[in-house]
Amino acid sequence: MSLDIQSLDIQCEELSDARWAELLPLLQQCQVVRLDDCGLTEARCKDISSALRVNPALAELNLRSNELGDVGVHCVLQGLQTPSCKIQKLSLQNCCLTGAGCGVLSSTLRTLPTLQELHLSDNLLGDAGLQLLCEGLLDPQCRLEKLQLEYCSLSAASCEPLASVLRAKPDFKELTVSNNDINEAGVRVLCQGLKDSPCQLEALKLESCGVTSDNCRDLCGIVASKASLRELALGSNKLGDVGMAELCPGLLHPSSRLRTLWIWECGITAKGCGDLCRVLRAKESLKELSLAGNELGDEGARLLCETLLEPGCQLESLWVKSCSFTAACCSHFSSVLAQNRFLLELQISNNRLEDAGVRELCQGLGQPGSVLRVLWLADCDVSDSSCSSLAATLLANHSLRELDLSNNCLGDAGILQLVESVRQPGCLLEQLVLYDIYWSEEMEDRLQALEKDKPSLRVIS
């Protein structure tokens, strides 16, 4: 539990009656109330409602992962329907809300002009519930800016009501509808709504929505026309290389200032990677890129690394987990690690880099100019024979703060070499992640002693 005079933050705690009685006065005065996965019941929703009625300071209420149901949510919302309520953020994610409960929520939105964020993911709202919700969102008194609707059982039929909201609300900034089967037709309707909207959208998240390569032309227009757009999440959609070719002209548009692009598991190969590299070279604004789960291969890795060495590329975070890389591409990544002055985070797990590849990476990391702070090498077929190189690198490199070696074939001999380096004052590593690695009791004692002797370090296993 986290508690100060302004916030109450409790997660994953079954609250006894005595504990609940202790917390009730705090619900009446805290600006931020988070009761995440606390086993709240309908009866306690009535207590929450009563407390909120007399709490004019409340700015954020998070009740996610409690089985409130429609009746419980109704009770809570009644507590917010007071003239003094100034709530800005409401999270009812995974609260067993259904479409039937959306009518009350819709009515409440009309009475909360200060509400800016609404999180409703993981509730079975359905198209009928979404229609009711949008009626409230369209009210002039509603000034919502951010709406999250992941896993809400929506179809393409929900996209026209959402498009109407986008057209009507110039203050709208973020829309998340990931993991709903809105498919190609629904995405096209949303894009048309955004095209017609004066809103300054900052984030659009459409992961696992059935987006196709044909939709990428529509999305290209959105990226080009919305200079405010900073994040575009399209992961787990069948875009393919054709889709990337359609999307990239929008990303290259002079007005595009996209910062984050998530296109993991999109069926992209080295060919599509080539189109994307043109964007990376031209757009200093692009800082975060996920290509995880695409079959880029070593050729795709080479293209990416050559681009990362270009002065126009200022990428800070690159996720290329599960991209079918081998040790053959590691010399290219080594050059990037040695020379690139912007890349801070590299997720390259679940690629067959093997010991030879990791040794190549260590050569780059050991150079004086290396700035990388986080490196994920989980499940890369690394063995104890790589650990001498890794150990030397940890002493030579003064930027690396987190290293993940989970699910590799390491034993006591390799881990001992890492421990001997990490325990040195000159090693600045703060987090060593070793999930699914097995060692002796003696090594367990060494790791516990290491954490005790060096409080700045966490060993996670």
From Swiss-Prot:
Gene Ontology molecular function: any one? ribonuclease inhibitor activity
- CC annotations in GO: angiogenin-PRI complex; cytoplasm; cytosol; extracellular exosome; lamellipodium; nucleoplasm; nucleus; plasma membrane
Q: What is the effect of changing residue 296 to P?
A: In IIAE12; uncertain significance
Changing residue 262 to A: what effect? Binding affinity decreased 5000-fold over the wild type for RNASE2
- Residues annotated as carrying N-acetylserine in the record are 2
Known post-translational modifications? The N-terminus is blocked.
PANTHER family per UniProt: NACHT, LRR AND PYD DOMAINS-CONTAINING PROTEIN 12, NACHT, LRR AND PYD DOMAINS-CONTAINING PROTEIN 3
Function, as annotated: Ribonuclease inhibitor which inhibits RNASE1, RNASE2 and angiogenin (ANG). May play a role in redox homeostasis. Required to inhibit the cytotoxic tRNA ribonuclease activity of ANG in the cytoplasm in absence of stress. Relocates to the nucleus in response to stress, relieving inhibition of ANG in the cytoplasm, and inhibiting the angiogenic activity of ANG in the nucleus.
Q: How does it assemble?
A: Forms high-affinity heterodimers with RNASE1, ANG and RNASE2.
Indicate what this protein is called per its UniProt record: Ribonuclease inhibitor
The protein's gene is named RNH1
